[in-house]
Structures are given as structure tokens and as C-alpha cells.
């Protein structure tokens, strides 16, 4: 029996964890195995090869850590940098704030570039810092690709353009937790040195895998890194890669089989089709928000996210009450506003293995909730705006043509 049972399917529309597809659930429904047997290394080898495809890299080296995105952050930092190293890090929302907190606690010299919440990274400030850094004291640029607290997406290619323009050797470390497998991400083309994601986001798996991919330049940086690391030491993994056994400690067998199934689904749909689907869902959600007479927390079109929409509420309405009522009355999970935007926004997650009709159900629920809390929404307005757009843009399902 569920701890808090509700009839029918629960509607999960937070920006992670996300819905898990049935084939993935079935793939994970298995007993434990001996990870030292030939089967698990053989499985792991194919996973590592295929994970590179979702990062769009041919030269990167992937690592599958039994952890969350927070552990993946730590792995990226401690394997490439030394205590006291200067980092330029962008603060644009709650999750970039948490990464910066981790950087400081790991004793890096963090040069914080802060923007108003709802804005993207201030690249003009970065350009100024790079132009003045003739001695190359900046060792890394840390940036969150998609900030789920505010629904803001940063332009990673523009960061690489600045680094190249100033011929600066700083490493580019990118949090792609809520973007990889949902938004356009090109590790090799954009010159990303370390990219990372988490299994519970667009991969549509349970929480528990922190997936990190390192460029050859990042691997070279491990030779001079003096940060203390044990659990997240890339060199331990690389040693077992060479042995062909792949695991320095016990992996989650069930998550590995789940990852295999998740990647198979991604390749069946096609990564570019998945990116296009997320673009449709994001556009439909924004049209609904506009029809309701509400505003997006994201302040410019160039920063909009196609994986999450943070919806601003009027001052007399508490965004957390919308989230509470969604769960209590409608069996719907929406995202809370966090930190500076707590109570000021609620968030609609539209990432992972989710389709257009599922989204329309969520939007219908939000309309009822808005009416419940006293907002004068015109019932059906957002659903009509979204469905009119989607009806003209949903493609045929390739496997059913």
C-alpha cells in the first residue's frame, strides 16, 4: 500500500525526479548479480560507449558514479582542480548557489558572478575578467546549463567563444543535470571539459547515478590536481577500465540495467526528436501561462528553458499553496519556488519521458488550482492555447507510421 494513496496515476510534473517509463521499470525488476562476473563488465562497456552519444562527444571519457548530481559536481571539481584555485562561477538560482557553496567548502577561490534570479549568466562580466587575466589565474569556469529554480537556460557555446577569443586555458565545467537528453548539448563542439548529469532527470531513471564525462584536457588536469578525493577519484575508475572490469567498487546492478533500457528508448525516439519534443512542451506551457495572464520568471526569450517553466504568481497568492493544493486535491506534483523566489513562483516541469497529452492534463489541473486559490483564471484558456499549438506541431510517432 502506498503511504499516501491516491486513485489513478500520480501526475509528476516537478523538474526532476521525473516519470520512469514502463520498459525501464521492467528492466530494473531483477535480482542482484555478481558484478565481477563477465556479464556486468560487458554491460558496462556498452553503457560507456552509448553514454558518450548523449553528451555528443567522441573524445570524452565517461564515469558512472553511484551518486546524485551533487556528487557529480564534487567529482568534476576535485579531479581537475586544487585547493586555492580561482574559479569563476555564475550564480543565477538555487542550484548554481548550491554548487558555489560546494566550491567554497572544497576550499577553492570562488569568483562569483551574480545575476538577478530570472536572468542568465552575465557573460559581459566574464569577458571583462578573462581580458584582465593575463597571467591565467582563472583555472575553471563553472556554469549551470539549465537552472531549474528559475527556468533559465544559459548559452554554453557563448562561454566557449569567449574563452577562445581571449585564448584562455581555463577549464569549462558544465552542470547539465536538467539539460542533457532534453536540450541541445554538444560537449565536443562547445569545448566543454567536464559535463555532468543525473539519472533522475531527462534520462528518466530513479535517482542514484551521477554521470560525468571528461575531455582529454580534463583528464590531463588530474595529473596536477591536489584536491582530496577518494570515492570520486577518476584514476581509480581508469585503472579498472584498463583491466576491463570497470568498477572499483560495487555498482547498482538494477540502475545499470535501467540505464541500458533508458538509452535504448532515447536512441529509438532519436535524440534530436527528443530535443524537439521538449521544445514543443516548453512552448505549449509558456502559451498556457500567457493565456492565464501570468508571467514567466525567465526575463528574456534568449534564456527560456524547455525543461521547466517557473510561473510568477500575484503578490496576494502564495505559490507554495498552489503546490500544496495540487498534491492534496488533484494528485499532481508541481515544483515549489526556492530561496529568493519561494512563494513567488510555482514550477511546471516538462522533461523526461512525458508527452503532450500528459502535459495538457497537468495544465488542466493547474487551471483548477488557480481557480481554487482565488486567481481569476478563465477556465480552459491555457489548455486551449497549448492544445491549439500542439495540434499543429505534434508529429506522427515514427514506430507507428
Curated annotation (Swiss-Prot):
<keyword id="KW-0032">Aminotransferase</keyword>
<dbReference type="GO" id="GO:0005886">
    <property type="term" value="C:plasma membrane"/>
</dbReference>
<feature type="binding site">
    <location>
        <position position="148"/>
    </location>
    <ligand>
        <name>pyridoxal 5'-phosphate</name>
    </ligand>
</feature>
<keyword id="KW-0601">Photorespiration</keyword>
<dbReference type="GO" id="GO:0008453">
    <property type="term" value="F:alanine-glyoxylate transaminase activity"/>
</dbReference>
<feature type="modified residue" description="Phosphoserine">
    <location>
        <position position="204"/>
    </location>
</feature>
<dbReference type="GO" id="GO:0009853">
    <property type="term" value="P:photorespiration"/>
</dbReference>
<comment type="subunit">
    <text>Forms homodimers. Interacts with RABGAP22.</text>
</comment>
<dbReference type="InterPro" id="IPR015424">
    <property type="entry name" value="PyrdxlP-dep_Trfase"/>
</dbReference>
<dbReference type="InterPro" id="IPR020578">
    <property type="entry name" value="Aminotrans_V_PyrdxlP_BS"/>
</dbReference>
<keyword id="KW-0576">Peroxisome</keyword>
<dbReference type="GO" id="GO:0009570">
    <property type="term" value="C:chloroplast stroma"/>
</dbReference>
<feature type="binding site">
    <location>
        <position position="201"/>
    </location>
    <ligand>
        <name>3-hydroxypyruvate</name>
    </ligand>
</feature>
<comment type="similarity">
    <text>Belongs to the class-V pyridoxal-phosphate-dependent aminotransferase family.</text>
</comment>
<feature type="modified residue" description="N6-(pyridoxal phosphate)lysine">
    <location>
        <position position="201"/>
    </location>
</feature>
<comment type="function">
    <text>Photorespiratory enzyme that catalyzes transamination reactions with multiple substrates, including asparagine. Functions exclusively as a catabolic enzyme in Asn metabolism. Involved in root development during seedling establishment after seed germination by regulating serine homeostasis and acetate conversion.</text>
</comment>
<dbReference type="InterPro" id="IPR015422">
    <property type="entry name" value="PyrdxlP-dep_Trfase_small"/>
</dbReference>
<dbReference type="GO" id="GO:0005739">
    <property type="term" value="C:mitochondrion"/>
</dbReference>
<dbReference type="InterPro" id="IPR015421">
    <property type="entry name" value="PyrdxlP-dep_Trfase_major"/>
</dbReference>
<dbReference type="GO" id="GO:0004760">
    <property type="term" value="F:L-serine-pyruvate transaminase activity"/>
</dbReference>
<dbReference type="GO" id="GO:0050281">
    <property type="term" value="F:L-serine-glyoxylate transaminase activity"/>
</dbReference>
<keyword id="KW-0007">Acetylation</keyword>
<feature type="binding site">
    <location>
        <begin position="68"/>
        <end position="70"/>
    </location>
    <ligand>
        <name>pyridoxal 5'-phosphate</name>
    </ligand>
</feature>
<dbReference type="GO" id="GO:0009507">
    <property type="term" value="C:chloroplast"/>
</dbReference>
<dbReference type="GO" id="GO:0003729">
    <property type="term" value="F:mRNA binding"/>
</dbReference>
<feature type="short sequence motif" description="Microbody targeting signal">
    <location>
        <begin position="399"/>
        <end position="401"/>
    </location>
</feature>
<dbReference type="InterPro" id="IPR024169">
    <property type="entry name" value="SP_NH2Trfase/AEP_transaminase"/>
</dbReference>
<keyword id="KW-0808">Transferase</keyword>
<protein>
    <recommendedName>
        <fullName>Serine--glyoxylate aminotransferase</fullName>
        <ecNumber>2.6.1.45</ecNumber>
        <ecNumber>2.6.1.44</ecNumber>
        <ecNumber>2.6.1.-</ecNumber>
        <ecNumber>2.6.1.51</ecNumber>
    </recommendedName>
</protein>
<dbReference type="InterPro" id="IPR000192">
    <property type="entry name" value="Aminotrans_V_dom"/>
</dbReference>
<dbReference type="GO" id="GO:0005829">
    <property type="term" value="C:cytosol"/>
</dbReference>
<feature type="binding site">
    <location>
        <position position="347"/>
    </location>
    <ligand>
        <name>3-hydroxypyruvate</name>
    </ligand>
</feature>
<dbReference type="GO" id="GO:0005777">
    <property type="term" value="C:peroxisome"/>
</dbReference>
<feature type="binding site">
    <location>
        <begin position="200"/>
        <end position="201"/>
    </location>
    <ligand>
        <name>pyridoxal 5'-phosphate</name>
    </ligand>
</feature>
<dbReference type="GO" id="GO:0048046">
    <property type="term" value="C:apoplast"/>
</dbReference>
<keyword id="KW-0597">Phosphoprotein</keyword>
<keyword id="KW-0663">Pyridoxal phosphate</keyword>
<feature type="modified residue" description="N-acetylmethionine">
    <location>
        <position position="1"/>
    </location>
</feature>
<dbReference type="Pfam" id="PF00266">
    <property type="entry name" value="Aminotran_5"/>
</dbReference>
Amino acid at each position: 500500500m502506498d503511504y499516501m494513496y491516491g486513485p489513478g496515476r500520480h501526475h509528476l510534473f516537478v523538474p526532476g525526479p521525473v516519470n520512469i517509463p514502463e520498459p525501464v521499470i521492467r528492466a530494473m525488476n531483477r535480482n542482484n548479480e555478481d558484478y565481477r562476473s563477465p556479464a556486468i563488465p560487458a554491460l558496462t562497456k556498452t553503457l560507456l560507449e552509448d553514454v558518450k552519444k548523449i553528451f555528443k562527444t567522441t573524445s570524452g571519457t565517461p564515469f558512472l558514479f553511484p551518486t546524485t548530481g551533487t556528487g557529480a559536481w564534487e567529482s568534476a571539481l576535485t579531479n581537475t582542480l586544487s585547493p586555492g584555485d580561482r574559479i569563476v562561477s555564475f550564480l543565477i538560482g538555487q542550484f548554481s548557489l548550491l554548487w558555489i557553496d560546494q566550491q567554497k567548502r572544497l576550499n577553492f577561490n570562488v569568483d562569483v558572478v551574480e545575476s538577478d534570479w530570472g536572468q542568465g549568466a552575465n557573460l559581459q562580466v566574464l569577458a571583462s575578467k578573462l581580458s584582465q587575466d593575463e597571467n591565467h589565474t582563472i583555472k575553471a569556469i563553472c556554469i549551470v546549463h539549465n537552472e531549474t529554480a528559475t527556468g533559465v537556460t544559459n548559452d554554453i557555446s557563448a562561454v566557449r567563444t569567449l574563452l577562445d577569443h581571449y585564448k584562455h586555458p581555463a577549464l569549462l565545467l558544465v552542470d547539465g543535470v536538467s539539460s542533457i537528453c532534453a536540450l541541445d548539448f554538444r560537449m565536443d563542439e562547445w569545448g566543454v571539459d567536464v559535463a555532468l548529469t543525473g539519472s533522475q532527470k531527462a534520462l528518466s531513471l530513479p535517482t542514484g547515478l551521477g554521470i560525468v564525462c571528461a575531455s582529454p584536457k580534463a583528464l590531463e588536469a588530474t595529473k596536477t590536481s591536489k584536491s582530496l578525493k577518494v570515492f570520486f577519484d577518476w584514476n581509480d575508475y581508469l585503472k579498472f577500465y584498463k583491466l576491463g572490469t570497470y568498477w572499483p567498487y560495487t555498482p547498482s546492478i538494477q540502475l545499470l540495467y535501467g540505464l541500458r533500457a533508458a538509452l535504448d528508448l532515447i536512441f529509438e525516439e532519436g535524440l534530436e526528436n527528443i530535443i524537439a519534443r521538449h521544445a514543443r512542451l516548453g512552448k505549449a506551457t509558456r502559451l498556457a501561462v500567457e493565456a492565464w495572464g501570468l508571467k514567466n520568471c525567465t526575463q528574456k526569450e534568449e534564456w527560456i528553458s524547455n525543461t521547466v517553466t517557473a510561473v510568477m504568481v500575484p503578490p496576494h497568492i502564495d505559490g507554495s499553496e498552489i503546490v500544496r493544493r495540487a498534491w492534496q486535491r488533484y494528485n499532481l506534483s508541481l515544483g515549489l519556488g526556492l530561496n529568493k523566489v519561494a512563494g513567488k513562483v510555482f514550477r511546471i516541469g516538462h522533461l523526461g519521458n512525458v508527452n503532450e497529452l500528459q502535459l495538457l492534463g497537468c495544465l488542466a489541473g493547474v487551471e483548477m488550482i488557480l481557480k481554487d486559490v482565488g486567481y481569476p483564471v478563465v477556465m480552459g484558456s491555457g489548455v486551449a492555447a497549448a492544445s491549439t499549438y500542439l495540434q499543429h506541431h505534434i508529429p506522427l510517432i515514427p514506430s507507428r507510421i
